[in-house]
Amino acid sequence: MITTVSKVFLFSLLIAISLCVSADDFTVGEITVPRGEQVSGFITVPEGMDEGSTIPVTIVHGASDGPVLALIAGIHGYEYPPITALQAMRTQVDPAALSGTIILVHIANMPAFLGRTIYYSPGDGKNLNRMFPGDPDGSITQRIAHILTTEIIDQANY
């Protein structure tokens, strides 16, 4: 049974958390971006039956409300033109002039990129393009697909 003190503590904790993360912030994985700013970082793909990984992303959260656009490069590790295009785009978007949010996934399949493989991840031999929506308990490629689906695609309008 929850006591009155416990209820007050839980309510206070809920209020404190909601004040720390403003309604105007945008969060992807471990990355939270205030309105009108741009932040780059990594989304963690946890270890499972094999190694974990990270997914480098940049989030440009516009000064005004609007739709969310997700651009994902590097589904296959050898797709260099989209990877470099998103890196260039990152420097060309002004969050103060943007309505909405852009999520740039620079390299979706880091194991394949580092392994310099064309279609398949060297860790499990799977093609990320065929793994969506993914499996949180599957192989590294299945977990990457799951993270991309739940953290990126599900938040995007386009």
Residues of each region from the PLM?
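Sec-dependent N-terminal signal peptides
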Residues: K7-L13
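A detector of low-complexity, intrinsically disordered, Ser/Thr/Gly/Pro/Ala-rich segments
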Residues: M1-I2, L13
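Structured catalytic-domain cores with a bias toward divalent-metal coordination
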Residues: I2-K7, V21-Y158
